[in-house]
C-alpha cells in the first residue's frame, strides 16, 4: 500500500521530521511518502494561512491519485482542504485532526483541544 502524507505548509524541516518519525513505525508492505507544497505558508497558524495552503495542497492530492497512491493523509490538525480533497479524488483522504477528534469521542464523553496559537482559540 502506498500512502502519501501531505504536510500542507512549506516547512521542509517539519516534513523531514514527519518522514523520520513515520519511517520508524512503517509496517511491511506500506510505503509512506511525505511531501509538502513548494508554495504557501511556512506555518498554518490562522484561517488566512489555512486558506493560502489549500490550493497547493489540493494540487498534491490530485497528483497523488494520478501517481497511483492508495490513500492521502493530511498532516495538519486543522485539516486544510479535507472536504474539498475528498470531492476531488476517489482514493481515501484522512485528516489527522478529524481522526484525532473521532478517536477522542470514542474514548470518552469529554475532551478538549489544546493550542499555543491565539488565532486558533474560538
Where are these regions (language model features)?
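N-terminal glycine-rich anion-binding loop in soluble enzyme alpha/beta folds
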Residues: 1-58, 116-122
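Glycine/small-residue-rich loop that forms an oxyanion/phosphate-binding "nest" at active or ligand-binding sites
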Residues: 54-109, 113
Amino acid at each position: 500500500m502506498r500512502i502519501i502524507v501531505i504536510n500542507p505548509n512549506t516547512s521542509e524541516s517539519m516534513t523531514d521530521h514527519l518522514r523520520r518519525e513515520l519511517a520508524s513505525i512503517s509496517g511491511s508492505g506500506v510505503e509512506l511518502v511525505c511531501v509538502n507544497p513548494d508554495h504557501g505558508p511556512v506555518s498554518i497558524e490562522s484561517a488566512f494561512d489555512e486558506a493560502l495552503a489549500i490550493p497547493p495542497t489540493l494540487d498534491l492530492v490530485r497528483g497523488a491519485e494520478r501517481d497511483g497512491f492508495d490513500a492521502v493523509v493530511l498532516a495538519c490538525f486543522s485539516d486544510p482542504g479535507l472536504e474539498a480533497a475528498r470531492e476531488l479524488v476517489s482514493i481515501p483522504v484522512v485528516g489527522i485532526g478529524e481522526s484525532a477528534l473521532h478517536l477522542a469521542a470514542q474514548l470518552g464523553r469529554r475532551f478538549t483541544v489544546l493550542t499555543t496559537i491565539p488565532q486558533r482559540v474560538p
